[in-house]
Amino acid sequence: MSVNYSETICSFQDTAINNIGTGKKYQTMAHTRSSNIRFVPAVTHDMVRSLFDPTIKKSFLECCITLSIFANFGLCYLFNLKFGQSLTKVFYLFQYILWRLSYNLGIGILLHYQSKNESLTSFAKLNKLFDKKSTSKLAKFCQFEISTKMANDYNMHNYPEEFNIWLLFRQFVDLILMQDFTTYILFVYCSLPSEGIDFKNWRILVGTSMILFNIWVKVDAHRVVKDYAWYWGDFFFLQDSELTFDGVFNISPHPMYSIGYLGYYGISLICGDYKVLLISIWGHILQFLFLKYVENPHIEEIYGSESDTNQLSNSYIDDLIVKENYDYSRPLISTGLRWKHYDLLRFSDHFTILSILAVVLIAIKTKPTEKALFIITITAKIFSASFTSYILFKQSKDKWFTKIFLKNGYTQIYCYQQWQFIYNYSFVLPTTLLILQTTSKIYNLYPNIEYTQIIFGGILCAIQMWCNSEIRAAISDFGWFYGDFFLINYISERRLTSQGIYRYLNNPEAILGTAGIWGTALMTNFCYENIILAIIWTSTNFIFVKFIEKPHVSKIYGNETRISGVGKTLQGLKPLRMIYDIFDDIGSLFLRNLIASNKHALNHSAASPLHLEFSIQEALENANAKLAPNCKFNLEPKPNDEYVLPESIKISWQLPIELYNNRDWIGLYNVLDTRTNRYRTKVSSSGHWCGTSREGYKSDKQNTMAIKEFHKNSKVVKGVVVFDYNLLIFEPGIYEVRYHSNGGHNVIMSSQPFQIKFPKFEITDQEILHSNLVNFLTKVNSINDGKFVENGSKYFNTRTFSCLLKKSTGIDISIEFIKKVSGDLKIISHRLCEIKKILDSLD
């Protein structure tokens, strides 16, 4: 059965909606597609009730359909007695093929022309099938069929032709779909093993579970979409109904075409016959073709295609990277079947493909043992997973990988390109080795492996390939290569995608991303080598997602929890909801007891540090009106709130005496590091801080030198601190200063964000450039005898000097070059101007 709203993952609500406030019952209106005639659709019943419920009226065709179903069972019994099971199986195989083609091809053609030209509706109007005065036998039969099918109060002449022809079309659909199902079941029955079924076998248990799940999918889908979408009603008329997300439509894209056919594979698993499995796959493929060529075009025509209207998507970021970096090209990607973005002028692409070919040719030529292949594969996987995970872990923590390239004169994009090569190579090499190992194992075990295992394993591999394809489609190259670890500055809007496969799963790579690996274990009859490999693949994937990807995502996009479609559906199930409620009650009880015990402890130790911390936090959050007028935290005004290095930052502060502590301190932070929490600083100041009172930090002269003024009276405490080159952060960005309490990290006050940037140096004249560099380094105490020195300022080192040159002149000079010329400013100035001239000459 198919549902044409599965593409948009939506469903129409029931035709009757109860209004609680008035107690009235409203019916959903509908209108015809072309003539726009409005009407209230009559009540209809689902296929099973229409055919088999004795309490519901039956039309002539419905009686014929029901009889044909029972006749097929009787015919199967007689055919089996006379011609044997083998011939009976072939007979019903051809019947199933006929009815499946009638479904996907026959119904598909009718719906295609109905969608394009409303052919069925036009045929009904042309032949006056529902006209009272019509005397044709076809019209009389159609009117008789509808009158016997519908309730006694139904008057077909009060309804438009679109609705009446849809009712007749349903009869045609019932016949084909019921025969399709019946002949498939009879074909499977004839294919069951003659020795019987062992219900303790894992295949029986898994297959039965798949069938039961399939039944739930069908039932829940009909609960959500009703007869209107079940029978392709929007090909004939349109309902004025609300679109909702519910049930099975939250679990999977196209649920009636994807997981709605899971029972096919469950039956094939129980049957244990690879021929049944192949026929099931064939039927499933036809259903996807029906979806692609019949339903999807109609959906796009009626409801529009699903497209990302947000220009700040990952795809937009990819385009932006290409636009801003002319030497950047899309990275090489393996789709499992072919290579995308192969660049003949990129050496790393040749290296990747030649490496894979070399591995394959060496394996074919040397014919390594299974043990050797296993050891090589597991080693390659562990090493590649560890290496890439380490890079991303360090990159998330302190931009380690980017810093390596920047300090050597390379760009951020170049760093990202090298990472793309490393990640892609680390992905395809272990995968290639796994394919070789699995192929070798299957070859050696071939006589003892069933075809069904190989086919099911291939299906799992296909699921993983599909999952990877859907992930790439949803998050584009930028997301696939973890661009938010390297190019955070390209992310204009920090919002996780909820499109494509991410509408249903939060981490599809953790759930479906290893399906193919377990498919190899199935194909090799669960040999211990492939089970170990599958465990390694799954474990490394889980560890990476849990301990590297999730923390980084929280840091970049915030801690907001997004509930996936699958999660919503599971929460809606009553048994699971009861379990959730029990855990919530336990958690609430525990939390109440914890709060009560904390209150008791606070009452007995009012002067404790814990009590002080709670008091300060309460003062911060409640913003006590009495104390607020005495709280001041101001920066020296600057045009556009910009500080051009190395000028100092002057900060004036004032606090009520009740809130002040001698151990209070002020820190300088990048706002990107502190944006997640305004009341507590969770990142280190990295030494960019100073105390507010020398008395509080008597032994720390380095961090009290910035104190310029300090005054204290009976009501307030105030002072002035100046962040000069000894405390400034010599990295351009948006910053803020935060006032912290009592040597801790609770924030009492914070400034408005301001910008720190390097000055712009004129590079067309060497003498002017040299003078500007000398002037800058003199102010930061990092010059001696016309040369740059590192020991003059704690935070202005060679790396910072290299960054200054890049930001102020637009020309990169590597750290190695600076060290090579011993920091000589004349040589550096000459080299910068020389590079500028060379670049200009190439334009």
UniProtKB/Swiss-Prot annotation:
Question: Which residues are exposed on the Cytoplasmic face of the membrane?
Answer: 80-89, 193-201, 272-277, 365-372, 440-444, 538-843
**Where are the Lumenal topological domains?**
1-58, 111-171, 220-254, 295-343, 394-418, 466-516
Bilayer-crossing regions: 59-79, 90-110, 172-192, 202-219, 255-271, 278-294, 344-364, 373-393, 419-439, 445-465, 517-537
Top EC category: transferase
Give the top-rank taxon of the lineage listed in the UniProt record for this protein.
Answer: Eukaryota
Name the membrane topology term. Answer: Multi-pass membrane protein
Q: Where in the cell is it found?
A: Endoplasmic reticulum membrane
> What InterPro entries does the record point to?
Phopholipid_MeTrfase, Phosphatid-EA_MeTrfase_fun
Catalytic activity line of the entry: a 1,2-diacyl-sn-glycero-3-phosphoethanolamine + S-adenosyl-L-methionine = a 1,2-diacyl-sn-glycero-3-phospho-N-methylethanolamine + S-adenosyl-L-homocysteine + H(+)
One of the protein's GO biological processes: phosphatidylcholine biosynthetic process
What's the Enzyme Commission number for this chain? 2.1.1.17
Q: What is the protein's given name? A: Phosphatidylethanolamine N-methyltransferase 2
Q: Which organism is it from?
A: Vanderwaltozyma polyspora (strain ATCC 22028 / DSM 70294 / BCRC 21397 / CBS 2163 / NBRC 10782 / NRRL Y-8283 / UCD 57-17)
Q: Lineage in the entry?
A: Eukaryota, Fungi, Dikarya, Ascomycota, Saccharomycotina
